[in-house]
């Protein structure tokens, strides 16, 4: 056993078994540091928070506060984990044994290539864990293996792997104890480092075999000890090898049930590298539901059961596109264990300030929230934030110490003769909970009181006066060293600040011809528009499609606002969400006309005026929550709306008969950034106060203010009295930081007050707003709706039936509910249409892309079914998502249903936005496409049609591979296949062996990827496209078929020319991809880190 150190617990160690006879005690076991029993901390009678116990254990193990969030407490058999907020009550006869373990895992912990902690610059990133955590993780893994907790196989190969792990274990012991291998093996048996089942196998061998195995271990141990690797490198190797052998050890699986049914239980699996997956029954084939950044909210409710099963809990996870996963857990502890796991991963990956529900919220985080205190961020991030705030003297940041659990750090900006400087003060918290700061005469009961005492205390730090004036409070989604960046996962969108600065708001929309529009009655006027009801008619393949539309005509008197009006149209045309109004396009004939879907019940403010007291509080809560979902979607995209009010919220479905109401947020219209002060004053109280201060930028926080005012309007049944005041009195209301009258529901009034905080930095994120609304919906606020006895209240659904249960596959779309909207694309083999799947017939269903064949012969149907099966099996951030299929009558026809990405294909996107897409963005796209192709290759899938036209754009920073019509799966045991019926092919993207012999492989896809790189860096300019360049090389008097001439050119070594602005390193990669021999081309797994390194090395 290792000698005592400063990490050894101060409490004496006694029994560590659940069967301990000691009464009235709680024991927290720590992983053993070597052979022997585990260390433990013991606590006597009283109440203990799980998070406080974790802090005590972290201090004993030397775990710093930065890494505290990786750990949690579990029962001794690991059947249940406890959220940080759990309270353990120890009474006279109780004895509880807990285990302190690292719960949150990430792929390839070590180094910076796969995952790392966020840094201000790409060269300032740091590893996820430090040496103390590494040591703890090693002890945890080693204990699991040698105790028999991990299931192990006993094939000859696996026996060799475990013997290798034993050698690494012995080598690190030799390093720690400074012993030679021979000396170590006199006191420690190599079999003590093996799983029990393998120990038994070896013990059952004859003497000669046991001696041979021991000699092999000794020789291997001498070789390892002779190398230069230190103890920590040996530990890291041990951990990586064990996680490679047992990847399930880094995931957690939960057995769940389908609500309202008595079927076989399903399985939920949570993993740090890909989020939540599910499987029906006991099948081990898991389907991905969502990654952590896609989660919008999580809620826990009592399951709708009666009788003995009343303890069951229903957990609902809502993802960004509106689909939900509902899973029924046998009890509250299991449900909280699952939610705490998802909650913890979300904080580590997405937002260190967020928690999904109060039942699992870490108490230390709640304390930080109340005190406007940051977590244990480093000094670099604190100074960076003060600089971003303008480096104003007196601004300060309060943060937890990254080194000490009982200390806080005050970092403030002070004025010196040389300019602004940054000084720090240490705040200590004593065991009684009092806070003290050197220079203050007495301790204070809270941080808030201590800081108030600092404001006019005359404190000096290093000779500089410390006069605090304003606090830089924590903000949602702030990037810091507390965030883990996972390479190869969907990039988080950057915070949006202004439509003019936002990527998606570049003018880009579908143009609608005048003769396709039919005008009906006038519906009134907007601030800048005349509004008409109308009809849009489109003819596709001789078939006429009619859609009822709303026509917004820009008033000619407001020509100066035309650009902002078109920016709003562009924004709405490039987003797709159930609770956002669909924009068909813009008609530019004479006046600018925005063509939108027609929402039948109109604006919700008018509806509330008509219905008055007949509208229940429960109905209003659901409407408010749906609005929050829409604004959360825009917030995640970094897109401010800027004009949130009840008149912009349209009611698509009234609700009733078990269905909830359904709203859609309309376009923002003209942005506040171009309006005069008089017009902005007219929008009080919906416009945020900062928008009146001649600001030329519109930030996301403005929408929180508008949401608060709209929520007040919805629950009050009409606009606030302030709307009828004179302009001067309205402005005075803002100058005095007035508040709207408080609603009678205290919690809702508090939420509105938070949203309408005059300091934009104090307003909550929409995820936090949704969390608080969930608390209202699942509380006694439902009683206010006064439902009729015997009639069930409407479900709290996001998208009107778009649910995904843990044990149910929602892959069949009824053809009659697919409503055609427009044609997205048409090729030689099929067409893709934009449709709305609308089973309720009220235009509330989700938008989807639907692919169907042009010709439906038996061969085409077979190939189409193969394409569907391939896409269905793929789950990657960089491949378009499969949604399901739709069958015609008698299953005579088949359609593929996919996610709809409104930004279109990469080819058109590059052509439209060439001026603002710089090299770093092109490299990001290239890396993402390469990662997607690497994923396909690992699944033996050859795409065969990789080109920019078949890459779809989800956002300014995210692309996905699509169109698997030509894709093939490689036969087992083969690295290529030969196409017998090649048909029409994109020859200018094909490798030589594909052109001459119809041979396709992962290497032929690499050739096509080289052509895609060429397309990226030429911005898909038609004048220098691959086909145009090769035809130019062939000359005007070319003889024979183009394919033969192309083969001759390639055999002569002719290749596409280097694009003018392409970096030399990318040109070299292109040439490697175009090597004549397939074996000389790099694999996607080799190209991916090279492109990643190029992208990370670019400025910005």
From Swiss-Prot:
InterPro entries: Band_41_domain (IPR019749), FERM_domain (IPR000299), FERM_F1 (IPR041155), FERM_F2 (IPR041046), JAK (IPR051286), JAK1-3/TYK2_PHL_dom (IPR041381), Kinase-like_dom_sf (IPR011009), PH-like_dom_sf (IPR011993). ATP binds at residues 824-832, 851. In contrast with the ubiquitous expression of the other JAKs, JAK3 is predominantly expressed in hematopoietic tissues. Residues 372-472 form the SH2 domain. It catalyses: L-tyrosyl-[protein] + ATP = O-phospho-L-tyrosyl-[protein] + ADP + H(+). Disruption phenotype: Mice show a severe block in B-cell development at the pre-B stage in the bone marrow. Additionally, they possesses small thymuses revealing a defect in T-cell development. The distribution of developmental subsets is relatively normal, suggesting a block in the expansion of early T-cell progenitors. Peripheral T-cells are present at normal or increased numbers but are functionally incompetent. The modification Phosphotyrosine is found at residues 781, 900, 935, 976-977. Transmembrane segments: none annotated. GO terms for cellular component: cytoskeleton; cytosol; endomembrane system; membrane. Residues 24-353 form the FERM domain. Residues 517-777, 818-1100 form the Protein kinase domain. Its main location: membrane. Possesses two phosphotransferase domains. The second one contains the catalytic domain, while the presence of a pseudokinase domain is required for suppression of basal activity of JAK3. Non-receptor tyrosine kinase involved in various processes such as cell growth, development, or differentiation. Mediates essential signaling events in both innate and adaptive immunity and plays a crucial role in hematopoiesis during T-cells development. In the cytoplasm, plays a pivotal role in signal transduction via its association with type I receptors sharing the common subunit gamma such as IL2R, IL4R, IL7R, IL9R, IL15R and IL21R. Belongs to the protein kinase superfamily. Tyr protein kinase family. JAK subfamily. This is Tyrosine-protein kinase JAK3. The lineage of its organism: Eukaryota, Metazoa, Chordata, Craniata, Vertebrata.
